[in-house]
Every structure is written in structure tokens, then in C-alpha cells.
Design a protein with these regions (language model features):
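Short beta-strand element of the alpha/beta-hydrolase
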Residues: 130-138
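Non-catalytic accessory segments flanking enzyme active sites
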Residues: 51-125, 129, 333, 342-345, ...
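Conserved alpha/beta-hydrolase
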Residues: 153-179
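The serine-hydrolase catalytic nucleophile loop
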Residues: 139-151
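C-terminal subdomain of alpha/beta-hydrolase-fold enzymes, centered on the catalytic histidine
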Residues: 285-441
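Conserved hydrolase catalytic core segment
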Residues: 152, 156-159, 207-256
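Conserved acidic catalytic loop of the alpha/beta-hydrolase fold
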Residues: 191-209
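Glycine-rich "HGGG/HGxG" loop immediately N-terminal to the catalytic nucleophile
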Residues: 96-98, 161, 174-188, 222
């Protein structure tokens, strides 16, 4: 008689042993440990066991590969050759311990907000009068995305800036992502997360702060700007929600762009049209049936392929990295992010954020069933800075930004970069945050 298959237990998020006093070794199974449970803000470290890493390599090596795609390009999805190069590097050359050491060298913490343990990195600047900023990642992401910008933001004098550019940096893990707890109930949607971030910043003692984000982080940040708590003085986004209603009407009608669009606006329309026609499948799956994605929780290569297929330009950039042509994002960057998700078993809990955010009243599919609030103005009330990267899937022409944001304080179109700005072009993003928030310091 076969034994029933049961789900593995969730890793404990806390023990009574502070990191500095821990006796944990790489051979022990516990991956998470923090300080005393009754502390409001508890120190945190993450240590994957040797067994967990061996299991990861074993699963990669045991991948059952499909046939090659029947086309010569990526129109059928992530290409076999790319995934085999990624798997070979992941199993034979990639070193997770480097990323782990980099993460644990930073001040990491856990605090309970609204019944859920939330992880965050908190780095204070040595410079007086540093401006506090909360920076939020997106999907498929984790706090690993923002590691490159921490030093330049907190220590600007060592990175080409002045002391007046300094920030205190707070980088939380979205609930269900990375090192934050996985929600066990419904309701952890972007507005709830936005309110949690306000609570976090106030808990840290900040009575005046700014916020920044891309992807889900952009939406969460803009919702914070719409809620407009008195402590939030401005926000910055690298994926602005500016699409006018007549443009969405034209996309839904599938009758071409509205009459009278300028060159930048037409380009933005064409990028959105391309995305809704050929790039939105991942979001539709997660928005409607996230729990069906068991394969990405069981197969590391399956998880990696699903993550790579975010948008066409990002996929092609990542594919070139595994061909030896790094354009800001390296192979290790890509695998650091994927490995965080694998080791924390947060592939499905992260996917559920799309389900939480998706309107459940619309009977249609396609554009009607996607989370349009990623792209439509939501009534930001605080000053906002916008950075438009040319390879972002959702373009934000200046005319749309001026229309969407009555308190637009900064707008700039960058010469290069795409959806993962903090990963791809950290220097540009840091410069944009310095410039964008300069008028509110």
C-alpha cells in the first residue's frame, strides 16, 4: 500500500536564537532563524542547508527536457537552448552562498504586520538628514533586485554623489515573496500591502518618508500615493500608471490607436498592444488559476522558464546573458533571484498576488481580465517622479504623465534599460531617485 503524499511543512520564520548566537550549520535543515519571538522588530538571517542545495542540483540534473520549439525564434516561448544553458550554469558553476553572504551582511529584520511576518532590509545612512525611502520589488522578484542600489543610496559620497543625496533605505519582501511569510488567508492584495508599508515605516520611527517601486512595487507605491498618509511626502516610479481611458478603449476594441496620438504616444500604444497580444499569458494564468502551477514549485527549471517568460524584451536580454553578453543583468543576478524563490518555496504564494489583485466581477478575458490598474491612473495625490526606461513593457510618454499626475515633480526618459531597472541599470535608477526627490528634501 502506497503512502499518501503530504505537503511539506512551511519553514519556521522564527526561533529563540538570535543570528549572532546561532549554532546553526549548513548541515542543519532549518533555513530561517530570527531573534526572540516577542520583539516587535527581530533580526533575521537566512541559511539554506547543504541538503536543500543538493536537492536543488539533483532536480536540475534530473530535468526531463521537452522537444525543441518548432520555430527559429521565441514566438513559442522560452527557447530550449536558453534553458539548457541556464540549467548547466545553475547546476555546475553558480554559487548560492555568495548571494546568501551578501544578503546576510545587510541588516535584515522580521516584524509582524496585520498578522503576517514581514521581512525587510533596513540600511541607515551615515549622513545626517538622510531621506527615508521604502523600495518595493515586483514579480518575478525579491529583495535581490534592489541590492545594487543600496550602497549608492545610503553612501552617496562613495558613489559619485554628495551627502545631500543620502537615503535611509527600507526594502521589504512582499507578503508571499522571498523571506516574508506566505499568507494563509485571502485578502493580501496591493492596497493591504500599501497600508502595511505605511505601518512599517511608522514603526521604524519615520515621520517623513518617500517611496519607490517598479512592477508590483510601482502599483503598491502609487496606491500609497493615492492613500496619501501625512508621512508620505513623495513617490517615484519606473513603471508609471498613465494610460488614458481612450487608449484602453481602443485596445479593447482592437481597432488600432486613437486618432491624434503623438509619436511617443503611438509608440506607447504599440508596446501595450504587443504586450496584451503576446506577453500577458503569465499574468492571466496567475490571475485566474495560480494554484494550478504545481510544476514551478516542483521543478527548478520549470520555475526558471516561467520567470524568464515575463516580457519579450526582458527575456531576450536574459537569454543574451546566458549567451555570454551581459547587458546590466548577469547570469548570477538572474539565478540569485530565482534561487531565493526556490529555497523559500514561494513560487505559488507569489503567484497568488495576481489573483488577489484581479477584479472578480468582469466576465471577459484578455485585457478585460488583466489587472488594468497596473497601467491606468489611480489618483495619486502626493508629488510623484517618473522615470521612463525605453524597454519597459508599459511606456509613459510625458504627455500621459502630466495628465495622470497633477503633482508631477520630475520626468525623464532614459537612454537604455527595461522592466527590471534596479537590476539592469542601477546607476540610472539611483540618479533618477536623487533627482526625483531633490525638491522635497
Amino acid at each position: 500500500m502506497t503512502q499518501p503524499i503530504t505537503a511539506p511543512p512551511q519553514p519556521e520564520l522564527a526561533t529563540a536564537v538570535p543570528p549572532a548566537e546561532s549554532k546553526a550549520t549548513n548541515d542543519e535543515k532549518s533555513a530561517f532563524f530570527t531573534a526572540a519571538d516577542d520583539a516587535a522588530i527581530r533580526p533575521f538571517e537566512f541559511h539554506a542547508s547543504d541538503e536543500e542545495l543538493a536537492d536543488l542540483w539533483r532536480r536540475i540534473e534530473a530535468t526531463r527536457w521537452p522537444d525543441r520549439e518548432t520555430v527559429a525564434d521565441d514566438t513559442q516561448g522560452v527557447q530550449l537552448a536558453t534553458m539548457q544553458k541556464l540549467a548547466a550554469y545553475w547546476a555546475n558553476e553558480y554559487d548560492w552562498r555568495k548571494c546568501e553572504a551578501q544578503l546576510n551582511a545587510l541588516p535584515n529584520f522580521i516584524t509582524e504586520i496585520d498578522g503576517l511576518d514581514v521581512h525587510f532590509i533596513h540600511v541607515r545612512s551615515k549622513h545626517p538628514n538622510a531621506l527615508p525611502v521604502i523600495v518595493t520589488h515586483g514579480w518575478p522578484g525579491s529583495v535581490v533586485e534592489q541590492l545594487k542600489i543600496i550602497g549608492p543610496l545610503t553612501d552617496p559620497t562613495a558613489h559619485g554623489g554628495s551627502a545631500a543625496d543620502a537615503f535611509d533605505v527600507v526594502i521589504p519582501s512582499i507578503p508571499g515573496y522571498g523571506f516574508s511569510a506566505r499568507p494563509t488567508e485571502t485578502g493580501w492584495n496591493p492596497p493591504r500591502i500599501a497600508n502595511a508599508w505605511v505601518t512599517l515605516m511608522k514603526r521604524l520611527g519615520y515621520t517623513r518618508f518617500v517611496a519607490q517601486g517598479g512592477d508590483w512595487g510601482a502599483l503598491i507605491t502609487e496606491i500609497m500615493g493615492a492613500i496619501a498618509p501625512p508621512e508620505l511626502i513623495a513617490i517615484h516610479t519606473n513603471m508609471a500608471s498613465t494610460v488614458p481611458p481612450e487608449v484602453f478603449d481602443a485596445l479593447r476594441a482592437d481597432q488600432g490607436p486613437p486618432v491624434g496620438l503623438g509619436d511617443d504616444e503611438r509608440w506607447a500604444y504599440e508596446r501595450l498592444d504587443l504586450f496584451f497580444r503576446h506577453g500577458i499569458a503569465y499574468a492571466q494564468q496567475m490571475g485566474q488559476r495560480p494554484q494550478t502551477l504545481y510544476g514551478i514549485a516542483d521543478s527548478p527549471v520549470g520555475l526558471a522558464a516561467f520567470f524568464l517568460d515575463h516580457d519579450i524584451l526582458s527575456y531576450r536580454m536574459i537569454a543574451r546573458a546566458f549567451d555570454g553578453v551581459a547587458e546590466g543583468v548577469t547570469r548570477d543576478d538572474v539565478l540569485d533571484n530565482i534561487t531565493v524563490t526556490w529555497l523559500t518555496n514561494t513560487a505559488l504564494s507569489g503567484a497568488r498576488l495576481y489573483w488577489e489583485a484581479l477584479p472578480r466581477t468582469s466576465p471577459g478575458f484578455g485585457i478585460e481580465r488583466t489587472n488594468a490598474r497596473f497601467f491606468e491612473p489611480i489618483g495619486v495625490k502626493v508629488p510623484i517622479a517618473v522615470s521612463a526606461f525605453p524597454d519597459e513593457l508599459n511606456q509613459a510618454p510625458r504627455s500621459w504623465a502630466e495628465r495622470a499626475y497633477p503633482k508631477l515633480i520630475h520626468y525623464n526618459r532614459l537612454p537604455k534599460g527595461g522592466h527590471f531597472a534596479a537590476f539592469e541599470q542601477p546607476g540610472f535608477l539611483v540618479d533618477e531617485m536623487r533627482a526625483g526627490f531633490s525638491s522635497v528634501r
